[in-house]
Every structure is written in structure tokens, then in C-alpha cells.
């Protein structure tokens, strides 16, 4: 973790990642690292069709979900671990909790959960991209991971 950009802090719902300084839109906040496994786990991040990143002590595990996030996960087309980056969607001030929308990377969550983000566009129940309707998919399209886009195209749900 680049300590000049992110730090871990205890929040109301447990440990979370916070910015330590202001950053511009599209800044790389973190390069995600870990082991690759074929099946989703409770704290994994899907980086390919049957490829998930896991690490018991990685700082990215403390990124909270939000339906209106301030960051996104950028994956290169090969899902190379060096190509998994967390980028700012908007300019961020120092001390802001960093969030991303889990529905942009996860086809089917190993452990679905009710969302408590409170956003007007809240999905309500976070189960995975496969459960989203056309309107929600259209809104998320710019930040959907390549493997999610490919799966949706194969199902005829994304043009």
C-alpha cells in the first residue's frame, strides 16, 4: 500500500481504507496484489472469468462497497495481477473513506449482503452483476470489469 495515499483506520463498521491526502480524479490509489484462486471467497476480488484475487492481509480487503463509489477497480484485458489498480472516480480530499461498487467486478458474490450505503441509486442487495437489471447495468457500464462485460455480452444483456 502506498502509505502516502491510503491508510487503514477503524471506522463505525470496522477497518476501512482512507485517503491520507487529496488526490485527483483517475489517480492510482493502489495496485492490488494477492494470490489467484478459481472460486470466489468471502474476501476475494474477481479479476477474471474464473479468477479471484485473495490475500488475508491485503489493504484492498478493507475497501467498502458503495452503490455510488468514489473509486473503481481497473483491470487490464489479461487480468495480470500487476494490472489490477484502484483508481479515483472523482477528486478525493484527505481523510475520505475509499469505496468501490462490488457489482462492477463480481459476477456472483460468495457471500451476498444487504447494502447499507443509503445512496439514491442503492441496489439494495449486493449479490453480483448477474442479478442486475438493464438500467443498472447501463449506469455501471463505464466501470464494469472486462470479464463481467464479456459474460453479459455472451448472454445478450450488453451491446
Which ranges hold each PLM region?
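Conserved catalytic SET/PR domain of SAM-dependent protein methyltransferases, capturing the structural core
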Residues: 1-159
Amino acid at each position: 500500500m502506498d502509505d502516502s495515499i491510503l491508510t487503514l483506520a477503524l471506522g463505525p463498521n470496522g477497518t476501512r481504507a482512507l485517503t491520507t491526502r487529496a488526490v485527483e480524479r483517475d489517480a492510482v490509489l493502489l495496485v492490488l496484489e494477492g494470490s489467484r484462486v478459481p472460486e470466489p471467497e468471502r474476501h476475494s476480488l474477481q479479476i477474471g472469468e474464473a479468477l479471484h484475487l485473495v490475500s488475508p492481509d491485503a489493504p484492498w480487503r478493507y475497501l467498502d462497497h458503495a452503490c455510488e463509489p468514489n473509486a473503481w477497480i481497473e483491470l487490464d484485458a489479461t487480468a495480470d495481477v500487476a494490472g489490477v489498480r484502484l483508481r479515483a472516480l472523482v477528486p478525493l480530499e484527505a481523510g475520505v473513506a475509499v469505496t468501490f461498487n462490488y457489482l462492477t467486478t463480481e459476477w456472483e458474490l460468495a457471500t451476498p449482503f444487504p447494502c447499507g450505503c443509503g445512496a439514491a441509486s442503492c441496489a439494495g442487495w449486493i449479490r453480483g452483476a448477474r442479478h442486475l437489471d438493464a438500467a443498472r447495468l447501463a449506469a455501471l457500464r463505464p466501470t464494469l470489469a472486462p470479464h463481467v462485460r464479456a459474460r453479459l455480452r455472451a448472454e445478450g444483456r450488453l451491446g
